[in-house]
């Protein structure tokens, strides 16, 4: 898809709030060996397999657990290190042999968990069994790569595990390199398991039990996570940073102040206005990278009135104040996903823009055709954990929808509860972001549009036509049938934009601000920080 030019707005100077000095906990150590990260919200669970684990929880799992394989790096679109979705490297495995319908992994013989327990093939199998059995997000994530049954994971010997393929699927091997198929200390977790909690979810929620480069030594939910380097890690060169302190600082003004006076080393969820101003100041390093396979969107619950009516959904799509959001909320730091030319052909790509633009007259006409000439009342919800973007989007949308008679009450959901509330699939109208870990169009649509109704099909959208296109693309990709694959990708994109159960707004950027003496940032599919490569000069 061709890149698009976007508006760069003139910025008004903003007052910076005073902020507390919060690096005192690290003064006893060399500042070069300790990194302070500040963000708006933090993890609600240390276990990627846990119920309702939020996005910040992904960062904990990524840095504290190993997987059998990972990705090589390449140079990204902005010249920075960027994961290579097509190239894999060994992580916990020392060797991978690919067969026609299986992959066999030899484990590193000297690999141990953070408590010194040797890692065996039994730990790998138990961990993968857990992922496909525990339910919810992790189980659906594994299924996206056709990994669905414990019988697919076979212990060959203490040092060898085999993964049997359910079918040919190009997503299977990439799916083993995402966060979910991490390896846990099975014997330790089993000791904490109960009849009601056979997978030890309660224990792993509070404790890291992996072999990754870092381990959590303390966690106060909503306040702070402290990591220490795992000196027993053998997955690569020893990380240069010994200690990571991750503080939750809700005020964006305070986070900016901490960066500007040098107390904090990294922040990655400041308002876009701040990132633009900080980049202009030149005192910090600012890195902006488009989300891979990701969009911010307005979602509608299509199983219940009034959003079960396609004309209502189209009316909302015409009423969204797209350009105002780009200008006033994002300050140009995003790729628009709206306003494609009326004669534009659908591309074999995702994300790609739809053809809707703000047109209040069209929206009013569609509301009348749908039987709602006077509108209706509803709520629009957002995740408070990312309020800096979500709240102004909802306010601007509320104002614009009022012009077509839709009166919205804004529902602010605490970040720790957001995933749980969203997964109930009862929110009528909401904004959210989704970024597919595997950078393939069909992967995004499996999660967000397929009638299997994954947790990320937050609209409860059902379409046999869309399902047929998605399933066809998966099969065609596995068989190398390029022509059918392209036809099916175009088909499910067209169907999604005709039915419009969710309205793409833009492809977000990951914006990271860091001190000039911090190096080693790399972009990953999960959009979170990888501590292994970070360093301080």
Where are the language model's segments positioned?
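Extracytoplasmic/peripheral linker and loop segments enriched in polar/acidic and small residues
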Residues: 101, 326, 403-418, 423, ...
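Long beta-strand-rich cores associated with HINT superfamily self-processing modules
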Residues: 512-537
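Ligand-site clamp/hinge motif
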Residues: 202, 231-277, 399, 407-409
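Gly/Pro-rich hinge or "lid" segments in bacterial periplasmic/extracellular proteins
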Residues: 70-78, 82-83, 87, 179-239, ...
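Surface-exposed binding/hinge segments that line
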Residues: 97, 141-193, 220
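Structural transition elements
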Residues: 214, 335-369, 386-392, 480
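Periplasmic-binding protein-like
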Residues: 47-50, 172-176, 274-277, 287, ...
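N-terminal lobe/hinge region of extracytoplasmic solute-binding protein
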Residues: 38-100, 129, 209-213
């Amino acid at each position: 898809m061709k890149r698009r030019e976007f508006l760069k707005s003139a910025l008004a100077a903003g007052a910076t709030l005073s902020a507390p000095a919060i690096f005192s906990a690290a003064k006893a150590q060399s500042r070069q060996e300790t990194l302070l990260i500040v963000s708006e919200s933090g993890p609600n669970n240390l276990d990627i397999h846990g119920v309702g684990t939020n996005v910040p929880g992904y960062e904990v799992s990524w840095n504290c657990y190993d997987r059998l394989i990972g990705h090589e790096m390449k140079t990204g679109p902005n010249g920075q290190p960027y994961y290579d979705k097509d190239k894999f490297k060994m992580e916990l495995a020392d060797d991978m042999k690919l067969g026609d319908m299986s992959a066999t992994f030899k484990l590193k013989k000297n690999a141990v968990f953070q408590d010194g327990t040797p890692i065996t093939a039994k730990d790998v199998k138990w961990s993968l069994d857990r992922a496909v059995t525990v339910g919810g997000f992790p189980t659906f994530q594994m299924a996206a790569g056709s990994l669905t049954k414990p019988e697919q994971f076979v212990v060959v010997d203490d040092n060898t595990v085999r993964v049997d393929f359910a079918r040919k699927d190009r997503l299977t091997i990439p799916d083993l390199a995402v966060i979910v198929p991490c390896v846990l200390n099975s014997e330790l977790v089993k000791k904490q398991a109960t009849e009601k909690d056979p997978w030890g979810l309660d224990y792993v929620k509070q404790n890291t039990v992996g072999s990754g480069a870092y381990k959590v030594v303390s966690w106060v939910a909503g306040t702070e996570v402290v990591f220490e380097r795992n000196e027993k890690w053998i997955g690569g060169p020893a990380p240069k940073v010994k200690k990571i302190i991750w503080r939750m600082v809700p005020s964006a003004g305070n986070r900016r102040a901490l960066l500007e006076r040098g107390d904090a080393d990294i922040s990655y969820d400041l308002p876009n206005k701040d990132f633009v101003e900080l980049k202009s100041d030149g005192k910090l390093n600012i890195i902006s990278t488009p989300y891979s396979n990701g969009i911010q969107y307005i979602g509608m619950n299509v199983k219940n009135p009034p959003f079960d009516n396609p004309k209502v959904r189209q009316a909302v799509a015409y009423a969204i104040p797209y350009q105002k959001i780009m200008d006033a909320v994002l300050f140009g730091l995003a790729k628009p996903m709206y306003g494609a030319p009326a004669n534009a052909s659908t591309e074999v790509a995702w994300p790609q823009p739809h053809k809707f633009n703000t047109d209040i007259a069209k929206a009013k006409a569609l509301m009348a055709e749908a039987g709602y000439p006077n509108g209706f009342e509803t709520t629009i919800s957002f995740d408070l954990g990312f309020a800096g973007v979500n709240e102004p989007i909802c306010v601007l949308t509320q104002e614009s929808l009022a012009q077509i008679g839709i009166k919205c009450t804004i529902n602010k959901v605490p970040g720790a509860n957001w995933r749980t509330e969203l997964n109930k699939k009862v929110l009528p109208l909401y904004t959210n972001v989704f970024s597919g870990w595997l950078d393939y169009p069909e992967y995004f649509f499996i999660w967000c549009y397929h009638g299997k109704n994954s947790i990320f099909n937050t609209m409860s959208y059902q379409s046999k036509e869309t399902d047929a296109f998605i399933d066809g693309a998966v099969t065609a990709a596995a068989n190398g049938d390029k022509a059918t694959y392209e036809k099916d990708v175009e088909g499910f994109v067209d169907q999604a934009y005709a039915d419009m159960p969710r309205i793409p707004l833009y492809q977000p950027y990951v914006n990271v601000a860091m001190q000039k003496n911090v190096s080693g940032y790399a972009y990953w599919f999960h959009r979170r920080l990888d501590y292994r490569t970070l360093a301080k000069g």
